[in-house]
Amino acid sequence: MTPVTPAAFEKRDNVVIFDTTMRDGEQSPGASMSHDEKLELAKILEEMGVDVIEAGFPIASNGDFEAVREIAKIVKNSTIAGLCRAHQVDIDRCAEALKGTQRGRIHVVIATSDLHMKHKLQMEPDAVIDVIARSVTHARNLRDDVEWSAEDATRSDRQFLRRAIETAIKAGATTINLPDTVGYTYPSEYADLFSWMTQNVEGADKVIFSTHCHNDLGLAVANSLAGVQGGARQIECAINGLGERAGNAALEEVVMALKVRGDKLPYETKIDTTHITRASRYVSAITGFPVQYNKAIVGKNAFAHESGIHQDGMLKNRETYEIMTPESVGQAPSSLVMGKHSGSHAFRAKLKDLGYELGQNALKEAFGRFKDLADRKKHVYDDDIIALVDDALARGSERIRVQRLRVVAGTDGQSAELTLEVDGEVKTSEASGDGPVDAVFNAIQQIVPHDAALRLFQVHAVTEGTDAQAQVSVRLEEDGRIATGQAADTDTLTASAKAYVNALNNLMARKEKSRPEAAIASGF
């Protein structure tokens, strides 16, 4: 494979979109994804037009290795990247995972700041330069597409960073990534860093420079765009801004900023923005991380107008208060109410409007659940259907299933009778508690003993009215592992039981993963 040169991208006025939802995004505490969920997300990202999909950290676990390998086999139009440290064994493992694709990228990372070299690597600068030369050379001998990342680049000595970049370029790197690992830099500083490097680094014209920004100060998107102004032609980002600590630059925000403000940043991406909402909802469903209502681009209120003045302006001309349309990011143009008399064809059309394309079996199951919901609710709104489909997606790998729940609550106490299916075996328990939710969770604890602590229990109504569905989020922590579960139901206690069980299933999945002794924890 011949790597595309920066000149080719400049000619097309393109910015490469590098998605790291499955790698850096999954490092967000509790954001674990199953193997099948990663495969489905990879398909969504490919359909969206993402240039590079970072599918995992192959040496971190067998699960990551298999995810990278399978995604490399099924994705044909996007480059698949695997992350590795600057160790030969890491690089070899990454190359092995990428064998199934002609569009594979080995992504090598090592820290370059004085702080990291002294305290984390415990290496002298000259030794780090030697490791860069050897590791990138080895990676380039295995793949033509090699990305090199300078962890903590924005806090690195500029002259040493230049030396490190030149070493990586001479060794064969085709993309140079300068991460703002701890979200410390300021837009003007980041733009200047890229401008200076592209002008002063020998061989800079032979590579693509990349941004990778964390959101610790809320500047990840602004810094990414500033990096492009300074000369970067690749942005590393994640759906919904998912990532370590405060997260990464949000893919949907950087893409729409480039699209809407082409007058200031005359660069294009290959992203089909009508897939954005679908991707956002899918990631939210499988990770259990709700999208905040006022989140830019994909939040529930992103295109909502309540002020009378705003509503009047919108009725006269939408452009008075909207700089983009809901349709441009894949949101349904209307909130058509459906009910128990709606047929499967109307349901399928509604799902398509909402950005969901389900297979025949999944569609049949979803329609059955819709009809059940319609029997319990007078009106079924778009948000109800979204919650219904997302609830199914969030279940993932189910070792534990809720079969039956009966709760008795009154002034004289609360008790729950619960039946679960655990690894194919049906088990029943009765428990009391300080409130009905506590009783339900105690009943689950009796059937599935565990030491996980409840860190989050959150309920919100999907729509208005007393028959509205309740959407429940639960977060559990055990031995430093965090897992989240979501569920929706017209019965709040049933939704609570399902969400808790989903979190337990995800916690079990996380336990099966193991990380190498020196695995990167920073998400660089």
Curated annotation (Swiss-Prot):
Entry annotated with the keyword Hydrolase: no
PROSITE patterns in the cross-refs: AIPM_HOMOCIT_SYNTH_2, PYR_CT
Subunit annotation: Homodimer.
Catalytic activity: 3-methyl-2-oxobutanoate + acetyl-CoA + H2O = (2S)-2-isopropylmalate + CoA + H(+)
Swiss-Prot/TrEMBL cofactor(s): Mn(2+)
Reported function: Catalyzes the condensation of the acetyl group of acetyl-CoA with 3-methyl-2-oxobutanoate (2-ketoisovalerate) to form 3-carboxy-3-hydroxy-4-methylpentanoate (2-isopropylmalate).
Protein name per the record: 2-isopropylmalate synthase
Family to which the UniProt record says this protein belongs: Belongs to the alpha-IPM synthase/homocitrate synthase family. LeuA type 1 subfamily.
MF annotations from Gene Ontology: 2-isopropylmalate synthase activity; acetyl-CoA C-acetyltransferase activity; manganese ion binding
Pfam families recorded: HCS_D2, HMGL-like, LeuA_dimer
Record-level GO BP terms: L-leucine biosynthetic process
Record gene name: leuA
PANTHER family on file: 2-ISOPROPYLMALATE SYNTHASE 1, CHLOROPLASTIC-RELATED, HOMOCITRATE SYNTHASE-RELATED
CDD domains xrefs: DRE_TIM_IPMS (cd07940)
UniProt cross-references to SMART domains, sorted A to Z: LeuA_dimer
EC number: 2.3.3.13
Region listing for Regulatory domain, in residue ranges: 401-524
InterPro entries: 2-IPM_HCS-like, 2-isopropylmalate_synth_dimer, AIPM/Hcit_synth_CS, Aldolase_TIM, LeuA/HCS_post-cat, LeuA_allosteric_dom_sf, LeuA_bact_synth, PYR_CT
Chief localisation class: cytoplasm
Highest classification ranks of the organism: Bacteria, Pseudomonadati, Pseudomonadota, Alphaproteobacteria, Caulobacterales
Domain Pyruvate carboxyltransferase: 15-277
Keywords: Amino-acid biosynthesis, Branched-chain amino acid biosynthesis, Cytoplasm, Leucine biosynthesis, Manganese, Metal-binding, Transferase
Pathway named in the protein's UniProt entry: Amino-acid biosynthesis; L-leucine biosynthesis; L-leucine from 3-methyl-2-oxobutanoate: step 1/4
Residues given in the record as Mn(2+) binding sites: 24, 212, 214, 248
The UniProt record lists the keyword Disulfide bond: no
GO CC entries: cytosol
EC class of the enzyme, as a word: transferase
